[in-house]
Amino acid sequence: MKMLTKFESKSTRAKGIAFHPSRPWVLVALFSSTIQLWDYRMGTLLHRFEDHEGPVRGLDFHPTQPIFVSAGDDYTIKVWSLDTNKCLYTLTGHLDYVRTVFFHRELPWIISASDDQTIRIWNWQNRKEIACLTGHNHFVMCAQFHPTDDLIVSASLDETIRIWDISGLRKRHSAPGTSSFEEQMSAQQNLLDGSLGDCVVKFILEGHTRGVNWASFHPTLPLIVSGSDDRQVKLWRMSATKAWEVDTCRGHTNNVDSVIFHPHQNLIISVGEDKTLRVWDLDKRTPVKQFKRENDRFWLIAAHPHINLFGAAHDSGIMVFKLDRERPCSFIHQNQLFFVNAEKQIQSFNFQKRVASLPYASLKGIGQPWDAFRSISYNPSQHSVLVNEANGKFALVILPKQPVGAVEPTSVTQDTGNFATFVGRNRFVVYNKNTESVEVRSLENKVTRNIKVEETVRTIVAAGPGSVLVIHPREVILYDVQQGKKVSQLAVKNVKYVSWSLDGQYVALMSKHTITLATKKLELINSMHETIRIKSAAWDETGVLIYSTLNHIRYSLLNGDRGIIKTLEKTLYITKVQGKLVYCLNREGEIEILTIDPTEYRFKKALVNKNFPEVLRLIKDSNLVGQNIISYLQKSGYPEIALQFVQDPHIRFDLALEYGNLDVALDEAKKLNDSSTWERLIQEALAQGNASLAEMIYQTQHSFDKLSFLYLVTGDVNKLSKMQNIAQTREDFGSMLLNTFYNNSTKERSSIFAEGGSLPLAYAVAKANGDEAAASAFLEQAEVDEQDVTLPDQMDASNFVQRPVISKPLEKWPLKEAELSYFEKAVLGQIDDLTIDDETPAVNTTQEQEEPLGEENFNDEDIGEDEGAWDLGDEDLDVGEELPEEVEQGEITSPAQEVETAIWIKNSKLPAVLVAAGAFDAAVQALSKQVGVVKLEPLKKYFTNIYEGCRTYIPSTPCELPAQLGYVRAYDDTVSEDQILPYVPGLDVVNEKMNEGYKNFKLNKPDIAIECFREAIYRITLLMVDDAEDEKLAHKILETAREYILGLSIELERRSLKEGNTVRMLELAAYFTKAKLSPIHRTNALQVAMSQHFKHKNFLQASYFAGEFLKIISSGPRAEQARKIKNKADSMASDAIPIDFDPYAKFDICAATYKPIYEDTPSVSDPLTGSKYVITEKDKIDRIAMISKIGAPASGLRIRV
């Protein structure tokens, strides 16, 4: 048994606590007169209630109404509203402190117990006191209604417990009936007498030797439990006629303040001032578990009315907890779920038939009765299960062949160990905490192998045949238990549970609030955070993760897109997702099948994968609506698809503008018809150069000045002149004047000034533009002599606007018409043979979801380790995709030589094809043009190999040359002549050379490794592939080979330096770390640089290299050494020897001089490998591949048919 704390509050002394029946709320009564309302699920304080004067002691939520009641040392009882968070009214009548208050479960009553030695019952609807129960002769510490019967139990400091019968009170206050005048008078007198006639003492229980602090009824049995200042917990039983003491639980060392029955199990829970919370076995009356706080006395314990939660009030606040885990153990094998039910019986559930079997066996004999199992693992070959207990033990149980009921298992092997799980048909692993190792054991429980584990292990999970995931507090490590070594690791904190995808390619690592998605090799894909606690997860057949929190079922795509599928009324644990069905286990160990709508997440996944036929099918067949889908489509860059879901004009207008669809935007703008919408449409039309649409909008909106400017910029002179007339008709002086500038109409402009009364301006315009007649007329009109007018010394003619050179007005910019997307073509019916049938990807339902078993040959012999000179690790490196080991050679054909080779050259001009056809000169010219090849000697043997490799010969006598028989083609299923090509060695040969290079790198043979990588480059140069994926992979391998050659060449240069050249040695060690090597290989370079710089007191540089090293390897002896170096270097923080290396600057390394080429510095590149050189190296031979000329003009390597 373990206390799992779900929430804690820090405050002054808490005297009372109450759970809301349906919401995750808890009320806390504080000694400081405050009542707090907490959301214990979110850990947030919702409200404070500050109306009591003095300490608050009693609290209770109403079972159905949004109210609660409180009582305290101010002698009052207050009823509060949860809707308004205000006090509704106050009940007065008690003459001393009120200790407890509780609602009746059915009737509108409140019961209160007080230090005035009375128990009072109130009607909270009419706010009247309906009974006052007297009889105790000391403080009444507690009084409660019976859950179902008309009984009350009360506890007092007079050392007694009283059971009261209130059936008469119920009868009197039930539905009104006819009563005589005498009965009414009797009822009033009875109330004045304290209603003792309606509430009578049924039993008085004596046995405690000091005051009794608490008494509680059992929820279903005729039992009472009490706690007293005599430090004892007593159990009482009652019948219809008598009540008696059953037993006493001793163990508390101070006053017992509160005690209750466990609502669901045969347990008693008590708290006391000895700072302990104790759990007792109800059947045996023996202690089960004790939980102690260091400094806080407990004052009250309360149980949630419906779920397995408890709350305890103590000196510094409250704690909400549950006793032990409620997650049922389960394991999926093929189409069956094996699980442990609430009675600790193992059952199976068939997903195909949707039925649960009878129990196979009872597991009650394993472990402690109150401790839940941590996990189970199933072995189908032996039909057995491994059961992990909570106390560091496990049991191997062989199940009956057929479920026959809850029988005791015939074969049970128990031993010490944690996290036992099967990894093969006859092997399982278990963590031995004492030796800190993972032990591989046989079915006879004999240890066959030990794997040392350095850090604390939280759990171990099967990861496929022969592999396990070891979960550490800060990382997850994938181990190959057959070879006894790490395969990969991922830094992720506090992982609790793991879920593998159906195909085993992806894994979800779940902590309390985080899900991390990774590949099967623990390469990080995505990580997401949830506010609500994550409970379980399973992958559906389409590769979408479905997971549950406390109150939701949610989904997540690999790219991090997620959403809510369904709201849960109670916590469920997902075991399998199949189509629209989600199979779950509840906390009672029962199977529940939920129906969900997977349309939303399948729609999003199809959109991410660009599976447009599926997108179209889902749109047509499903009811996909809502802002969620629309905003998702908008965010994902598919506004044209979002338009299909929207009817609202505002949203359609926004989407059309985002998509650039002016036609739809215009239709919606006409519906909306407001100025802001038209303005936005104009801006978009102008941005797209659609002058005709902008013209139409300006006309409808009467924006004449903007329309004039539009005509000006588009060169529409005729319409621009008409705007002058329109302005005159409108008598708009400003518009008239503006149009004269646009039209260069100086005569009209001077006339407008004159008509406006500005004769000086009219005269100046006429004079400046040479209109002497008009100028004289204006002088005459002003009655001014020309000699009296002073003009500026220099005036230019006011032809501001150049006449357009275009002959025809521009209505639309000549834009390139965008191609229709697949989706748009499908909507328009432009896709032939489009089928949108509802086809769910076929999934083999018999495939194991989390099956750790297989037919592997498990070798118990120790596997030898490489004794490489680096001595820095022995991890292998995978390059690119896994390629076939054997090339499928085509059938041998024998046409005439000239015909066959001519067909090859006709079908492809790749260098490899030309070499195979024997056209060596043409091949050399092609290589020279593509990648600048000038040195042919290294390629000679590859020319010969390719030429001879695509031909077959007949063996002859030793003195004769072999006769050629035929040719080997690349494809044996070629049906047309234009697809006939020769066989050329493929990527498998390249991959073999790369792996050979990695091996020599690890063995510290840099010169041999360089030759291997260089040979891989030569192979790629004469390669032939037939798809884009292989082409991309080949170029990637070429870049990788270049980086390894560069890095190893730098290291060889460093080793060749003479002693005393420290600066250059440190520089080369630093430059080696800049080569883009595999992370595990880069650690070699980082360790060399770190050690050398630390040795020569370059502490700043050493700290940087140590930090980079720890990013790759965070545990183990080398990591510990790096951590020490970093700590020491950080404390010194200085460099003794300045070098030309800035770790934070962007630069490349010259492959000839091994010096940095910083950004914006002139450089040249090799056309084949892409390596960088200083400008002085131009026209020299490349140092990486040794066959091409640096800086030569080239078109790029072509290897794809």
UniProtKB/Swiss-Prot annotation:
GO terms, biological process: endoplasmic reticulum to Golgi vesicle-mediated transport; intra-Golgi vesicle-mediated transport; intracellular mRNA localization; intracellular protein transport; retrograde vesicle-mediated transport, Golgi to endoplasmic reticulum
Membrane protein topology class: Peripheral membrane protein
UniProt-recorded Gene Ontology molecular function terms: structural molecule activity; ubiquitin binding
Coiled coil (UniProt feature): none
The keyword Chaperone appears for this protein: no
Superkingdom in the source lineage: Eukaryota
Pfam families: B-prop_COPA_B_2nd, COPI_C, TPR_COPA_B, WD40
Subcellular location: Cytoplasm; Golgi apparatus membrane; Cytoplasmic vesicle, COPI-coated vesicle membrane
Keyword entries, A-Z: Cytoplasm, Cytoplasmic vesicle, ER-Golgi transport, Golgi apparatus, Membrane, Protein transport, Repeat, Transport, WD repeat
KW Transferase (keyword) present: no
GO cellular component assignments: COPI vesicle coat; Golgi membrane
Region feature Disordered, mapped onto this chain: 842-862
Compositional bias segments (type: Acidic residues): 848-862
Repeat region (WD), residues: 9-39, 51-81, 93-123, 135-165, 207-237, 251-281
Alphabetical list of PANTHER family matching this protein: COATOMER, COATOMER SUBUNIT ALPHA
Subunit structure: Oligomeric complex that consists of at least the alpha, beta, beta', gamma, delta, epsilon and zeta subunits. Interacts with the ESCRT-0 subunit VPS27. Interacts with KEI1 (via C-terminal region).
Free-text function comment from the UniProt entry: The coatomer is a cytosolic protein complex that binds to dilysine motifs and reversibly associates with Golgi non-clathrin-coated vesicles, which further mediate biosynthetic protein transport from the ER, via the Golgi up to the trans Golgi network. Coatomer complex is required for budding from Golgi membranes, and is essential for the retrograde Golgi-to-ER transport of dilysine-tagged proteins.
Note: Present with 15200 molecules/cell in log phase SD medium.
Protein name listed in UniProt: Coatomer subunit alpha
Organism lineage string: Eukaryota, Fungi, Dikarya, Ascomycota, Saccharomycotina
Gene (UniProt): COP1
